[in-house]
Curated annotation (Swiss-Prot):
Its cofactor is Mg(2+). This is Gag-Pol polyprotein. Residues 814-822 are annotated as: RT 'primer grip'. A motif (Nuclear localization signal) lies at residues 26-32. The modification Phosphotyrosine is found at residue 131. The record marks 988, 1001 as: Essential for RT p66/p51 heterodimerization. Residues 631-821 form the Reverse transcriptase domain. Mg(2+) 3 binds at residues 1211, 1263, 1299. Residues 14-33 are annotated as: Interaction with membrane phosphatidylinositol 4,5-bisphosphate and RNA. Residues 489-493, 537-543, 576-588 are annotated as: Dimerization of protease.
Length: 1435
């Protein structure tokens, strides 16, 4: 502030502080006002030192004067400088108002003096007014370099406006009178905008070449005293000196090289502006409710960016501004006439737009339209006589609009009779309810008819039927025997349904009109009295005579009712007669060939009980089903059908009507699988541009296609009665049901078959079909196109598929699949982002969905921070506070969505180009186009594949996403333009093995460029110090050490807390990078750390890795190498000892790597690894704990059931819709399992025989499933001599072992699922893993080892039993070591090689073989009296 205070000193400061800010005000000027003024001058590129002198103040005022019409701030600045000037000149002023007036007087006087002097001198020496070229005291032209303030102002403009249209006038103003050298200085200051500068350079080169073509250089030397003609490159300042530029600009006649170069730059800036704001002036149209002022703002903002001459821009303003206004404003503007100024236009159009204005205009027009002529202008002309009917609203009762356009709140109840509980279209008052009660529709099946059959008799067309006789409809039998249609005349609706009718003995031709309430005839004389009446006809009101109780005969059926006679254009038989004769309008089911459908093998239909429903739901469902039955969509069934699916009803959105829903989940599980006909939805960017387009919708799509007859029984459902008063009413579907899994696929394939003839017949028509949406495009003239569309609709109708007029779109924009299609462009349907105070999880999910949908055409949409709000397990209704970043992101997205953005259509003759830009950390955006600035499609990518990543890796992921998208939409891969230099890509691609293929691409200089921030050397750096690094941590205490040892004997160790081995390894590398010189070799034994750093990440989710990245960027060269741990390698062993002391318990575990490898493949449990690789349990458990697939549950401890070796439990389990049969050996837990095609007795028996052929099976234990109790299984068990036992019904514990094994097996299948393509492979892999790679339970064996051990032990035991029986026939005589007398005989229990085991008097002894005699016991008779053996009997 001190520097600026020096502007005034001493007495001047006193007089400054006496001047009032306002006339008569109390506040006076202070020093702070001078400080403020000096700051403001920086914005206008003016030197602040000018304030110190009166001349300086004059110069400032000259600069500011042209801009005084601008803001208030500018006016304040001018006034302050004027006051300061008065203080410098010692002109006495009391307040701010007086100062500018004084200045004005002085300026006028000096101007007159200058003019006078000019007259006197006769303008002999005109001084160039061109600044920065000025004349010095000697009269020479010299150059004043462009000031830093001007450059500063220019840089600010570019940074703030980012090449928006405002940049061009700003540039033009700042470069007033500049030389080419000055202009190049200005361009160099904004050289960071590389893409823009490149475009500018191209434009300048083109213009310079054009200049050289028009102004060829003269050949030979230049005559003395003359200056050379400038070339294109001279004008651009590249081959000319500053002196030459000044001479050209000040010569007589001058060559304004500065102005020419400036014009070229402005041309280039125009192109840049077009790229940065790619909206054409032709696209600026006023919205229906947009204020005229906003439209004008948008129009002129875009006009400034247009590349056109001033004349063309003038023409655009005169014509396009009016032409593209909305109809309301256009009417007013045209009335103003062609010469109207913009001010007049804006005044006239103030407040125009919106419904209130429309109502005002309409009211005025109606009040003026008194005569018939005015009425003719307002109303449509008609061919019918009589007065025009005035429309009146049912809802509010006012005239002039219909109820559907009414803005008043909706009146409750019916608009016709006023009663609540139904709407007008369901009202029975004054309306023959001919589509509801007593309808005669065949109850049988929809008959298959060939399209060639005569349509007059075909029930597949829309038709009217008239019932003969008064008998009500006979019930159709279960087999659809009621071929009722034979009794009825059938009138098809291919032509108008005209019939001959007998009235009062006269025959006349009349139209059967199901839409007319009354019967109206013309030119017929009827007997009896009549009364006059007015009725509303097609062309207005007509006067008729009303005759009551008239007999009428149609098709042999009589009816008595009211007939009206009057001037009707055609005789009409209305509903008052049609209902009496039982005439029905029938919606037949399509004659499309049915697609055969089956249940999955071995499965039966659903048998799910109907749950109770409320009375109102039962009533609603009864009504709906009656209607569906009349239309042939469902049929009643008897008790013979055992299947059932539950149904329920829900209220339709914003309506009192109910909607029937069927819970087909169980049937869907049991129905065969279908191939999804269409894998995704079509995208408009893949459409080709067509001259004529129509969008159609197939009405009641699924209900138009018949269901396979043999499958219908499985769709049975029941409408229950209240309090089980009567049995429920049972129905089954005849058509594709909503919610059944086969409906979409069958409908799509049927639709394709139906459309095939149309596609073949009209190859010039493009038909896109997605479910019931049809897009038809052609290059035909609109009349021919519409004729073809009618042909197509007719063709669809022959097959029973209607295309309602309500959803038939003839004019653009077409709404299709959530997109809005225009003739030459497309966009997504308008997206409204909700404004909310509190956002729930569900709200944010919907918001992200909307933004993702919009991102396919709106470039720059981001959702990263909004998605972050959804992290963690939250309930849908939880309220989530928005973070500042998410608020910012949402605000940016709202801004982007404000301006509508359009994509164009695909031109197969041009190549596709995809351009990618980096938007921010982990956020990318791309555009796919064929011509610049005309995007087919845009998109974003914001995934982060791994914790440590870099831009190159992400760029490859983006490219692969776009390539896939290209193949799906256009069938080809676009050519890529990527913001990465070829050298950078090559370096990374050759070094980093995980890089995937990327297609053909070229470099585009769009900042920010993707680069590798550092590079690791491939060979050790000679002369650089080598750091051996290591880290260790204790799992229990979380304490650790990290450190390094160098080849020069230096060492450093730090202690860490709350760490892990992996973190400690990274700490050691960070320490080495921190302590080392710019070039360093680092040796680690951690594969983990090596893997992270070799991928060259430039950012990471880990703070520690980010620190390492920072250190790596600072280094000149880094070589990182790995050595195996604990292998006695010099420096590695030294550092290992240092960091291990007091930390590591086990220093050397060689088997870890192999164990980890085995675990990745087989997911063995810790016991198996501990025993196979000699690992301590804690290490083996750690391997299991670090595996994400084995984290599902804790380690299972398999206890043993004490069972005999021949018992197996069998069961069937289901996975992925397939059946797996599982057999478990109860004693060992060993499994045999395989996928079987069906859960039948045959398959089960075959499996049991296979099992018996491999293992000794004595007993099988199964549940009571139909396959296990089948005859085939009994026969197999009888043949293989296996006893079959059954579990207790409904008690899963009786099958406990196999049930728990099913779970175990499914768990293992889940762990190895991604290694196998088919389930049967995964099952066998899981069996192998369970049997041989999991240890535990008795003996710590695996199940495979245990079963072999159990069977072997069993055989040995049996053998032993036999031996024991034999051995018991021997007697042993023995003697002790001290006693020479033989003792015995004792029982022989065991005879070994060196000793025998004997039992003597219940005492078991081991006797050496040499001291025992074994004799066979031949019985008593063999022994003599004095035989030693005789003692036995005495004993």
């Amino acid at each position: 502030m001190g520097a600026r205070a020096s502007v005034l000193s001493g007495g001047k400061l006193d007089s400054w502080e006496k001047i009032r800010l306002r006339p008569g005000g109390r506040k006076k000027y202070k020093l702070k006002h001078i400080v403020w003024a000096s700051r403001e001058l920086g914005r206008f590129a003016l030197n602040r030192d000018l304030l110190e002198t009166a001349e300086g103040c004059v110069q400032i005022m000259k600069q500011l004067q042209p801009a005084l019409t601008g803001t208030e701030e500018l006016r304040s600045l001018f006034n302050t400088v004027a006051t300061l000037y008065c203080v410098h000149q010692k002109i006495e002023v009391k307040d701010t108002k007086e100062a500018p007036e004084e200045v004005e007087k002085i300026q006028k006087n000096s101007q007159q003096e200058i003019q006078q002097a000019a007259k006197n001198e006769g303008n002999s020496n005109p001084v160039s007014q061109n600044y920065p070229i000025v004349q010095n005291a000697q009269g020479q032209m010299i150059h004043q370099a462009i000031s830093p303030w001007t450059l500063n102002a220019w840089v600010k403009v570019v940074e703030e406006k980012a090449f928006s249209p405002e940049v061009i006038p700003m540039f033009s103003a700042l470069s007033e009178g500049a030389t080419p050298q000055d202009l190049n200085t200005m361009l160099n200051t904004v050289g960071g905008h590389q893409a823009a500068m490149q475009m500018l350079k191209d434009t300048i080169n083109d213009e310079a070449a054009e200049w050289d073509r028009i102004h060829p250089q003269q050949a030979g030397p230049i005559p003395p005293g003359q200056i050379r003609e400038p070339s294109g490159s001279d004008i651009a300042g590249t081959t000319s000196t500053l002196q030459e530029q000044i001479r050209w600009m000040t010569s007589n006649p001058p060559i304004p090289v500065g102005e020419i170069y400036k014009r070229w730059i402005i041309l280039g800036l125009n192109k840049i502006v077009r790229m940065y704001s790619p909206v054409s002036i032709l696209d600026i149209r006023q919205g229906p409710k947009e204020p005229f002022r906003d439209y004008v703002d948008r129009f002129f903002k875009t006009l400034r960016a247009e590349q056109a001459t001033q004349e063309v821009k003038g023409w655009m303003t005169d014509t396009l501004l009016v032409q593209n206004a909305n109809p309301d404003c256009k009417t007013i503007l045209r009335a103003l006439g062609p010469g109207a100024t913009l001010e007049e236009m804006m005044t006239a159009c103030q407040g125009v737009g919106g419904p209130s204005h429309k109502a005002r205009v309409l009211a005025e027009a109606m009040s003026q339209a008194s005569g018939a002529a005015a009425a003719a202008i307002m109303m449509q002309k008609s061919n019918f006589k009589g007065p025009r009917r005035i429309i009146k609203c049912f809802n509010c009762g006012k005239e002039g609009h219909l109820a559907r356009n009414c803005r008043a709140p909706r009146k409750k109840g019916c608009w016709k009779c006023g009663k609540e509980g139904h709407q007008m279209k369901e009202c029975t008052e004054r309306q023959a309810n001919f589509l509801r009660e007593n309808l005669a529709f065949q109850q049988g099946e929809a008959r298959k008819l060939s399209p060639e059959q005569d349509r007059a008799n075909s029930p597949t067309s829309r038709e009217l039927r008239i019932r003969r006789g008064d008998s009500p409809l006979p019930e159709a039998g279960a087999k659809g025997e009621g071929a009722i249609s034979l009794n009825f005349p059938q009138i098809t609706l291919w032509q108008r349904p005209l019939v001959t009718v007998k009235i009062g003995g006269q025959l006349i031709e009349a139209l059967l009109d199901t839409g007319a309430d009354d019967t109206v005839l013309e030119g017929i004389n009827l007997p009896g009295k009549w009364k006059p009446k007015m009725i509303g006809g097609i062309g207005g009101f007509i006067k008729v005579r009303q005759y009551d109780q008239i007999l009428i005969e149609i098709g042999g059926k009589k009816a008595i009712g009211t007939v009206l006679v009057g001037p009707t254009p055609i005789n009409i038989i209305g509903r008052n007669m049609l209902t009496q004769i039982g005439c029905t309008l029938n919606f037949p089911i399509s004659p499309i060939e049915t697609v055969p459908v089956k249940l999955k093998p071995g499965m039966d239909g659903p048998r799910v009980k109907q749950w109770p429903l409320t009375e109102e739901k039962i009533k609603a469902l009864t009504e709906i089903c009656k209607d569906m039955e009349k239309e042939g969509k469902i049929s009643k069934i008897g008790p013979e059908n055992p299947y059932n699916t539950p149904i329920f009803a829900i209220k339709k959105k914003d309506s009192t009507k109910w909607r029937k829903l069927v819970d087909f989940r169980e049937l869907n599980k049991r129905t065969q699988d279908f191939w999804e006909v269409q894998l995704g939805i079509p995208h408009p960017a893949g459409l080709k541009k067509k001259r004529s387009v129509t969008v159609l919708d197939v009405g009641d799509a699924y209900f138009s296609v018949p269901l396979d007859k043999d499958f219908r029984k499985y769709t049975a459902f029941t409408i229950p009665s209240i309090n089980n008063e009567t049995p429920g009413i049972r129905y089954q579907y005849n058509v594709l049901p909503q919610g059944w899994k086969g409906s979409p696929a069958i409908f799509q394939s049927s639709m394709t078959k139906i459309l095939e003839p149309s596609r073949t017949k009209n190859p010039e028509m493009v038909i896109y079909q997605y479910m019931d949406d049809l897009y038809v495009g052609s290059d035909l003239e609109i009349g021919q196109h519409r004729a073809k569309i009618e042909e197509l609709r007719e063709h669809l109708l022959k097959w029973g598929l209607t295309t309602p007029d309500k959803k038939h779109q003839k004019e653009p924009p077409f709404l299709w699949m959530g997109y809005e299609l225009h003739p030459d462009k497309w966009t997504v349907q308008p997206i409204q982002l909700p404004e909310k105070e509190d956002w729930t999880v569900n709200d944010i999910q919907k918001l992200v969905g909307k933004l993702n949908w919009a991102s396919q055409i709106y470039p720059g949409i981001k959702v990263k921070h909004l998605c972050r709000l959804l992290r963690g397990a939250k309930a849908l209704t939880d309220i989530v506070p928005l973070t500042a970043e998410a608020e910012m992101e949402l605000a940016e997205n709202r801004e982007i969505l404000k301006e509508p953005v359009h994509g164009v259509y695909h031109d197969p003759s041009k190549e596709l180009i995809a351009e990618v830009q980096k938007q921010g950390p982990d956020q990318w955006t791309y555009q796919i186009y064929q011509e610049p600035y005309k995007n087919l499609k845009t998109g974003k990518y914001a995934k982060r594949g791994s914790a440590h990543t870099n831009d190159v890796k992400q760029l490859t992921e983006v490219v692969q996403k776009i390539a896939t998208e290209g193949i799906v939409i256009w069938g080809k891969i676009p050519k890529f333009k990527l913001p990465i230099r070829k050298e950078t890509w090559e370096v990374w691609w050759t070094e980093y093995w995980q890089a995937a293929w990327i297609p053909e691409w070229e470099f585009v200089n769009t900042p920010p460029l993707v680069k590798l921030w550092y590079q690791l050397e491939t060979e050790p750096i000679p002369g650089a110090e080598t750091y051996y690094v290591d880290g260790a941590a204790n799992r229990e205490t979380k304490l650790g050490k990290a450190g390094h040892v160098t080849d020069k004997g230096k060492q450093k160790i730090i202690t860490l807390t709350e760490t892990t081995n992996q973190k400690a390894e990274l700490h050691a590398i960070q320490l080495a990078l921190q302590d080392s010189r710019p070039e360093v070799n680092i040796v680690t034994d951690s594969q983990y750390a090596l893997g992270i750093i070799q991928a060259q990440p430039d950012r990471s989710g880990s703070e520690l890795v980010n620190q390492i990245i920072e250190q790596l960027i600072k280094k000149e060269k880094v070589y990182l190498s790995w050595v195996p741990a604990h292998k006695g390698i010099g420096g590695n062993e030294q550092v290992d000892k240092l960091v291990s002391s007091g930390i590591r318990k086990v220093l050397f575990l060689d088997g870890i790597d192999k164990a980890q490898e085995e675990h990745e493949r087989y997911h063995s449990n810790w016991r198996a690894m501990a025993s196979d690789f000699n690992l301590p349990p804690v290490v083996a458990k750690e391997i299991v704990a670090s595996c994400d697939k084995c984290q599902l549950k804790g380690e299972a401890m398999h206890g043993q059931v004490d069972c005999s070796p021949g018992i197996w439990q069998l069961d069937c389990t289901h996975l992925e819709g397939k059946i797996i049969i599982v057999a478990v050996h109860v004693a060992s837990g060993y499994i045999e399992a395989e996928v079987i095609p069906a859960e039948t007795g045959q398959e089960t028996a075959y499996f049991i025989l296979k099992l018996a052929g491999r293992w000794p099976v004595k007993v099988i234990h199964t549940d009571n499933g139909p396959n296990f109790i089948s005859a085939a299984v009994k026969a197999a068990c009888w043949w293989a001599n296996i006893t079959q036992e059954f579990g207790i019904p409904y008690n899963p514990q009786s099958q406990g072992v196999v049930e728990s094994m099913n779970k175990e097996l499914k768990k293992i299948i889940g762990q190895v699922g991604d290694q196998a393509e088919h389930l049967k492979t995964a099952v066998q892999m899981a069996v192998f893993i369970h049997n041989f790679k999991r240890k535990g339970g008795i003996g710590g064996y695996s199940a495979g080892e245990r079963i072999i051990d159990i069977i072997a032990s069993d055989i040995q035991t049996k053998e032993l039993q036999k031996q024991i029986i034999k051995i018991q026939n021997f007697r042993v005589y023995y003697r002790d070591s001290r006693d020479p007398i033989w003792k015995g005989p004792a029982k022989l229990l065991w005879k070994g090689e060196g000793a025998v085991v004997i039992q003597d008097n219940n005492e078991i002894k081991v006797v050496p073989r040499r001291k025992a005699k074994i004799l066979k016991d031949y019985g008593k008779q063999m022994a003599g009296g004095d035989c030693v053996a005789g003692r036995q009997d005495e004993d």
